[in-house]
Amino acid sequence: MIPVTEFRQFSEQQPAFRVLKPWWDVFTDYLSVAMLMIGVFGCTLQVMQDKIICLPKRVQPSQNQSSVSNVSQAVASTTPLPPPKPSPSNPVTVEMKGLKTDLDLQQYSFINQMCYERALHWYAKYFPYLVLIHTLVFMLCSNFWFKFPGSSSKIEHFISILGKCFDSPWTTRALSEVSGEDSEEKDNRKNNMSRSNTTQSGPEGSLVNSQSLKSIPEKFVVDKSTAGALDKKEGEQAKALFEKVKKFRLHVEEGDILYAMYVRQTVLKVIKFLIIIAYNSALVSKVQFTVDCNVDIQDMTGYKNFSCNHTMAHLFSKLSFCYLCFVSIYGLTCLYTLYWLFYRSLKEYSFEYVRQETGIDDIPDVKNDFAFMLHMIDQYDPLYSKRFAVFLSEVSENKLKQLNLNNEWTPDKLRQKLQTNAHNRLELPLIMLSGLPDTVFEITELQSLKLEIIKNVMIPATIAQLDNLQELSLHQCSVKIHSAALSFLKENLKVLSVKFDDMRELPPWMYGLRNLEELYLVGSLSHDISRNVTLESLRDLKSLKILSIKSNVSKIPQAVVDVSSHLQKMCIHNDGTKLVMLNNLKKMTNLTELELVHCDLERIPHAVFSLLSLQELDLKENNLKSIEEIVSFQHLRKLTVLKLWHNSITYIPEHIKKLTSLERLSFSHNKIEVLPSHLFLCNKIRYLDLSYNDIRFIPPEIGVLQSLQYFSITCNKVESLPDELYFCKKLKTLKIGKNSLSVLSPKIGNLLFLSYLDVKGNHFEILPPELGDCRALKRAGLVVEDALFETLPSDVREQMKTE
């Protein structure tokens, strides 16, 4: 016989699946076991005991004449003979005698089998087997969604993640931290209420006792203690769990196969319950103890009518009623399950209660199969959902990332990355990190902080520890800031650089930095930037002196005009977008430096001539061809630097002689062919760059420039240099490479301060030994072919090689 344990495979599932079995599924499982035992018990009785016992019936002679001759005379009487009555005087000696049928054992077995098959009702015969089959079907229906590949894979994945989330140290840390904060808030509220009842203090006193100020150090202590309990490995495991939960949520929320399958298997169980109740109630009366059997087997047994006893009828009748009770309870439970499935919205799951209890406000609601599984888990233990919700929170994930970040970037490791930037400040560059390490604020000597490609940066109040911080660079970073940190930056920050791809990376809090002196903006703005409200608040930057915008604006923003009264330097790098409507420049009366780079200008803007305080003008990479307007620069008495490089200028007008205050002049990367002698009447020029043009001749008037320190004609077509060039005694840098020069005059020895000389790319055959008189010129400052350098006397070469 098959033992009961062999049927367990029909209802077995992984022990972890129990979290998805609500109380009604557990209850129906126990009912199934009870019904299974009924079926197995009935089948065992069917196999091990006699199913039916039959005896032949005696009939009247008129009805049995054909068979009288085949039986003995003792049984031929028309009425059964009564058994002899024992004598009361001698009861022990009287022998009991019954009716003889003259049938052997084989005939009785044959009669029993024939009557069992022909006369016994099928329900009485197959009742235990029906119970067994129905129970197995119930078990299969209850556990089918645990076995079906389309659903079991999701369930296994979910339970695997759920168990890891439940046991993760990060879950305990996050919930205990929130619990600690909640208790602090309650204590603070009680203290505040008691104090307000006992004393009538002013607003200043109540502010000191407020939670926002008092609880900060307490929370800091909680963070420190809990942070030590989570090592680096556990932090990485928790980080991986967050990623798994995200991917699993996206995958499971797409469909509702689990919900649909559970509903269908429940509906199937209800239908089966109704069928079982219907036919069992109708047929249970067919289980009878006495059965009349009429079979035509006279030729083999001599009898046709038999009276049979169904030996297990009494027990089967009781078992059937018991089975009906179990099935009824099972069915009512399934009906309640259907009510629960259709009455409640199981395709949506709200974490509102968890959000209120834990204080983690950003836990999202879920839907479809994800929601259904969470509803099922709540029937098992709501604590699972509460702990699992921690891994759905971005706030919790950010805290974990912050903790891992702090463990990875220690103060010593950060100090190794310190460097000096272009502003001669001690700078810490952080590129492509998951966040801003809290350990940064332990480097108190930091003067400049540079963040690149870091999303969701939160600048905490601890930035106030950086007493020397003056410069902040944000390149493609979305930044939020604590109110205390903003107050600190308002007072201390001098330089802010922001590089953004969209307006969301342009921090809205930067417009309140009242002590900011330099602002650099790099990113794509709308062409109609004057209507961009995010720039209108620049007027609050009362201390702003330098403003640089590298974008694609079509006109100067009105926000820039709002700070024109104190703006001293403005740079617009326009990436080739034509800049029009420059009349707003006239309002910048205090402007000393102006850069209009790559703005597609064809003429020098007339508005520039109104900037009487202008000292430097840079019109790089425009489309200037004619600069006749240069005569108007004579009104700009303070103009000392003029850069007209990287344009298409073909000639220099003679009016340039009127710019007597010029000290730095750059015409490099143009198409100039002739240098006017009037150029050298600007005798204050110290820096003159004429490289990358088509110049063939240098006028001898260049000797007038006695203040000249830098002169470059690199990449021109000059064939000879005038001797007057060597009258410029203060010349330190001379670049004459990539020309057509064949001889270098020995008078170059007159340039005693010369420290950099580029002669490479000419037709020189020998270098004059007078180069040795240039005591400041060393080998590193002499750009020349190695073979040509060897033409110098050995003592000159040795002199240049010595430092």
Swiss-Prot record:
Chain segments annotated as transmembrane: 23-43, 126-146, 267-287, 321-341
Topology within the bilayer: Multi-pass membrane protein
Residue ranges annotated as Cytoplasmic topological domain: 1-22, 147-266, 342-803
Subcellular location: Cell membrane; Endoplasmic reticulum membrane
Biased composition (Polar residues): 191-209
Disulfide bonds: 54-308, 115-293
Residues covered by region (Disordered): 177-209
Modified residues (Phosphoserine): 212, 215
SUPFAM superfamilies xref list: L domain-like
Pfam families: LRR_8, Pannexin_like
Signal peptide stretch: none
PANTHER family assigned: PTHR48051, RAS SUPPRESSOR PROTEIN 1
UniProt record similarity statement: Belongs to the LRRC8 family.
Protein name: Volume-regulated anion channel subunit LRRC8C
